[in-house]
Amino acid sequence: MAATKKRVLLTVNPFLVTGKRMSTQRSLITALDRHADLIVVTAGDYDFAAGRVRAYRRMRGGTFEPLGMIAPAADLWIVYSDGYYLDHRARGFAKRRDFFRAQIEFHQRFLASGAVGRVINEPAVEGRTLKSWFAGLDSAVYRTIPTFVASSLDEVHDLVKGGQGIVAKPDWGGAGLGAHRLLSESDVRRFGEGLGKGRDHELSDYCFQPYRPGDEKRVWFAGGHCVAGRLRVGGRTPWSDSTDRYDVRPYVAGMQDFDADLRAAEKLAAHCGLSVGAIDFIGDSINEINGCGTIFTEYKFWQCIVDARPALVRYCVGAVREL
């Protein structure tokens, strides 16, 4: 008699079930569907009050059969908390970060109740992927860019006066969306004029870091261990379209600074408790942590330069087998 497969929930980008490629998540779905009783649920489609999620099953050909709204129950739940691009107000949240925190609390509720046996990443760990978590770290110990939160624009003005400019970054965000480089008092005024008044962000949605030039480096983790790295030179930023020096290459042992960067990334990952995700550098400083929704590939235009999906799949399939 065949052993009963373990039930696994996998939260995915909602656009995946409508046909978007989403290669990292599709790789996971294909592999997990062979080894587990897999239920796919979509980020942004949680009914927080009723305690239900919108669920799907993978069908032949990579399509998805809707199962309706179900109560989460599984041996393992692999979560995805990167819905920063979704409209939080349409989901009943006045503040963007409240939408994020509701997801963290939702996962924790079902973990604590025993309805879900294990969550990757653990809810508290996903909570530490907010950039504001860096504000409580000793930047000298963890090689992070000093990070600040501000309760007023006057505090932002003070930060600009104290250095060579700052970067305002959404506390919960990615891909440079909503980021601003503030070099002067007039930059801060314009930034302030764009906040609130029914717009997408408020001051409390932002964190602030000193502007640091440098190459962008990423170290991917699966199971708490480094599985790949990449180095990006001369990429676009929210304030510059210049790509004269643009290049992407694997970042591996033997390259300049790799060993020191890896030690710093591993130290921060251990402190955070990160199981699946990535740690990003600008120059020689860590500027953010990415959680379980991280894309595990890097492309240069149409060419895949780094593909860390196999390592992610091995880890997640291994986690199922250990249940």
Protein language model features and the residues they cover:
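C-terminal active-site "lid" helix and adjoining low-complexity regulatory extension at the edge
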Residues: A3, G254-Q256, A270-L274, G283-L323
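Structural motif
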Residues: L9, I78-Y80, V167
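Short glycine-rich anion-binding loops that position phosphate/pyrophosphate groups of nucleotides
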Residues: D82-Y85, D171-G173, C292
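Extreme N-terminal starter segment of soluble prokaryotic enzymes
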Residues: A3-L9
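A short glycine-rich, hydrophobically flanked beta-strand micro-motif that places a catalytic Asp/Glu
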Residues: Q209, K217, L274-D284
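Phosphate-binding site of ATP-dependent enzymes
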Residues: A175-H271
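Hydrophobic alpha-helical segments and helix pairs
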Residues: A124-G176
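Conserved N-proximal alpha/beta basic substrate-recognition cap immediately N-terminal to
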Residues: L16-D33, I39-T147
